[in-house]
Amino acid sequence: MAGGYRAEDDYDYLFKLVLIGDSGVGKSNLLSRFSRNEFNLESKSTIGVEFATRSIRVDDKIVKAQIWDTAGQERYRAITSAYYRGAVGALVVYDITRHVTFENVERWLKELRDHTDQNIVIMLVGNKADLRHLRAVSTEDAKAFAERENTFFMETSALESLNVENAFTEVLTEIYKVVCRKALEVGDDPAALPKGQTINVGKDDVSAVKKVGCCSS
């Protein structure tokens, strides 16, 4: 890594992301592909909640993503509030081969927006893009929906590692930009923030500026 070795817990920002969408759309495999570069064909539905972390570089800052994954099945919806709390980014995932999972995106978006800050960065993700011959949701329909809902959009394949890195990286980069804009809007000099100051993008301080400096370019 440029600039020398940095310890795992050495980061400038910590951003909480959530993965949502129907059960079986590939949320857990997207998470394992991004965080560990692994894919498990035998993966079962996630029971309860799990999360993984990974740090990336944005500009000259280290951004650590804490990515939460839960089953999309209705019986787990009691964990909703705690799951969303503090999230500043979300990947709303559907399966391009199952149209019903795309139809349900609207409900997932409503639930997400009911529980998070208005500035949350959202990426609509059409997963399983490797199954082109089974496609049930057109790229054009999904793009049009994303534009109407003011979200980003990308098609991915956790199996082939297609666009997985790009989807997470784009969300994290956009969150970073939002944090920087908010610091600038209130008249702060982002480079002069007191050490350890938190900038709230969401409803609590899960996503925080850990050290001095923001967007100094």
Curated annotation (Swiss-Prot):
Gene3D superfamilies cross-referenced by the UniProt entry: P-loop containing nucleotide triphosphate hydrolases
Q: How does it sit in the membrane?
A: Lipid-anchor
UniProt-annotated binding residues for GTP: 21-28, 69-73, 127-130
Q: Which domain of life is it from?
A: Eukaryota
Lipid attachment in record (S-geranylgeranyl cysteine): 214-215
A GO BP term here is: vesicle-mediated transport
Q: Which UniProt keywords apply?
A: Cell membrane, GTP-binding, Lipoprotein, Membrane, Nucleotide-binding, Prenylation
Q: Subcellular localization, per the record?
A: Cell membrane
- Tell me if Cytoplasm is a UniProt keyword of this record: no
Q: Where is this motif: Effector region?
A: 43-51
PROSITE patterns (alphabetical): RAB
Q: What cellular-component terms does GO give this entry?
A: endosome; plasma membrane
Q: Name one GO molecular function term.
A: GTPase activity
Q: Report the principal subcellular site.
A: membrane
Report if keyword Cell membrane is assigned.
yes
Q: Entry's NCBIfam families? A: small_GTP
| Entries under PANTHER family matching the protein | DRAB11-RELATED
Q: Which protein family is it in?
A: Belongs to the small GTPase superfamily. Rab family.
Would you tell me the protein name for this molecule? Ras-related protein Rab11B
